[in-house]
Amino acid sequence: TPELRQNAEGLIWVDIRSLTDTKLIELVGNGFQIHPLALEDVLNTHQRSKLEEYDNGLFFVLHNLRLDVENLDLVSEQIALFAGNNFVVSFQEDPDDTFAHIRKRTQEGLGRIRKKGSDYLAYALVDNIVDGYYILLDEIETQVLELEEMMYTNGSDPACKARIFDLKRVVNQFRHRLLPLRDAVARFYRTE
């Protein structure tokens, strides 16, 4: 509720994992006075990465990406963050906890997150997602190396050609997700 927010000491972080309970999302959105258009974007999980400024905070949409190695497909989970004066509300599309290690650090009092404001927590959450992109790039590199080895041993096998096209599609999908994020992150750093 707004009263809880105003009377709370320190930083409040509400993390919603899974977007299936729309009533809960609406309740939290109303309690933290999150703009209705931002809440609509939370529930519409096909948003491009973006940063929007509202009177009472910043709204960030980004994507947690991972590689489905078996099918050579890029899997995307939308993450939305709303950072206000003394609070951050994060919305994770999937029930898996993308921010588990950040939560552990805050609960154990490690690092600066609890001592800093909502902007620092939002930065840490965004940084966590971006760090995952390096893992994704390592996985893509591994696939390229395996593909090179496959080409040397099997020649121009049809399965090898199919994997080349699959990998090219993954790289293009990654680039498509990365470009809007670059712009949003640049705007985020300028608002600090």
Predicted regions and their residues:
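Peripheral, non-transmembrane regulatory/ligand-interaction domains of membrane transport proteins
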Residues: 1-192
